[in-house]
Amino acid sequence: MQFSTVASVAFVALANFVAAESAAAISQITDGQIQATTTATTEATTTAAPSSTVETVSPSSTETISQQTENGAAKAAVGMGAGALAAAAMLL
């Protein structure tokens, strides 16, 4: 009974860690907005564009976009798992 408790707690901690590592990446703009990455696939359409005159606008923004590659979720999940294992070890 005690081994199964420790094994299940370890499995839950490992599952949380794997889920946190396999999450899709997002980026956060400096003003607090969060946007998804542009890895989504879209289907191509075969309709012709309407004929019109379009002026090219060059980007003149000096804003920088900082990307957050990881957060504390993985560390929290591992810490929670370690705490749960310590609590289970105390019950032995």
Swiss-Prot record:
Extensively O-glycosylated. InterPro entries: Yeast_PIR_rpt. A lipid is attached at residue 71 (GPI-anchor amidated asparagine). GO terms for biological process: fungal-type cell wall organization. One of its GO terms (molecular function) is structural constituent of cell wall. Pfam families: PIR. GO terms for cellular component: cytosol; extracellular region; fungal-type cell wall; side of membrane. The record marks 33 as: Covalent attachment to cell wall glycan. Induction: Down-regulated during anaerobic growth. Residues 72-92 form a propeptide. Belongs to the SRP1/TIP1 family. Component of the cell wall. Present with 1590000 molecules/cell in log phase SD medium. This is Cell wall protein CWP2. It comes from Saccharomyces cerevisiae (strain ATCC 204508 / S288c).
